[in-house]
Swiss-Prot record:
The keyword Hydrolase applies. Belongs to the DNA glycosylase MPG family. It comes from Rhodopirellula baltica (strain DSM 10527 / NCIMB 13988 / SH1). Keywords: DNA damage, DNA repair, Hydrolase. This is Putative 3-methyladenine DNA glycosylase. The lineage of its organism: Bacteria, Pseudomonadati, Planctomycetota, Planctomycetia, Pirellulales. It comes from the Bacteria.
Length: 233
């Protein structure tokens, strides 16, 4: 079961709690991540990812991921071996590997055993908790016409909304009380689409991107979806 303190904090913080059957919610354990990145990337879809900032939980459901392999993957940061900047990618499974790109950041969850150098990039969330705080972090004004896609669609926006930067690199969200990764809505295989990864120039042909088909918070092209991109979990 999810840690009682974390569960109670979620209940106190957000009206969206009514949508969640907390009795069936479980925090993911290190064993979940100690598997091949493609398997983890697929099974993270529909899971919750959140952190607590100044007493407020911010986060949502994972709706898009990409797997980065420990070998034969030129796009992976581990392709040239362990270095100071990517050391967390070789750490314990479930560790956060955060790296900067174009003045923004990307957040990954490390997979497989220590020293392997594989991870799953979280590309998009469906925002659920602490939405007002996320708008503040993004420097946006919330209104009835503001699209929530501006918060957590794409890895850079996602990190900005959750105030994730290099200071978060190396954190283990399974053990840190201010982070949480937990099970969520179960997705049938018909709701999951697999495509090549996007936004990279090497090994771009590998089918290692996974997303919730039809979910409006997924990044990338509409034509990648089999159903209209307007649904939520």
């Amino acid at each position: 079961m999810m840690n009682d303190a974390k569960r109670n904090q979620f209940r106190e913080d957000d009206e969206e709690d009514r949508l969640i059957d907390w009795g069936s919610t479980q925090s993911l354990q290190s064993q979940f991540f100690d598997r091949r990145p493609a398997v983890v990337a697929r099974q993270l879809l529909g899971c919750g990812f959140a952190r607590r900032i100044e007493g407020v939980w911010v986060g949502g459901w994972i709706v898009e991921t990409e797997a980065y392999l420990s070998s034969r993957d030129a796009a992976s940061h581990s392709a040239r071996g362990e270095k100071p900047g990517n050391a967390s990618m070789f750490g314990r499974p479930s560790t956060l590997y955060v790296y900067p790109i174009h003045a923004k950041h990307c957040v990954n969850l490390v997979t497989e055993s220590v020293g392997c150098g594989s991870a799953v990039l979280i590309r998009a969330l469906q925002p659920v908790w602490g939405i007002d705080r996320m708008f503040q972090h993004r420097g946006l004004h919330r209104s009835e016409t503001t699209d929530g896609r501006a918060l957590t669609t794409g890895p850079g926006r996602l990190c900005q909304s959750l105030a994730i930067d290099r200071t978060c690199d190396g954190v283990d969200p399974i053990r840190d009380p201010n982070w949480c990764v937990f099970s969520g809505p179960k997705l049938p295989s018909s709701r999951v689409t697999t495509t090549p990864r996007i936004g990279i120039s090497q090994a771009a042909e590998l089918p290692l991107r996974f997303f919730v088909d039809g979910n409006r918070y997924v990044s990338g092209l509409v034509r990648h979806h089999r159903r209209p991109r307007r649904d939520s979990l």
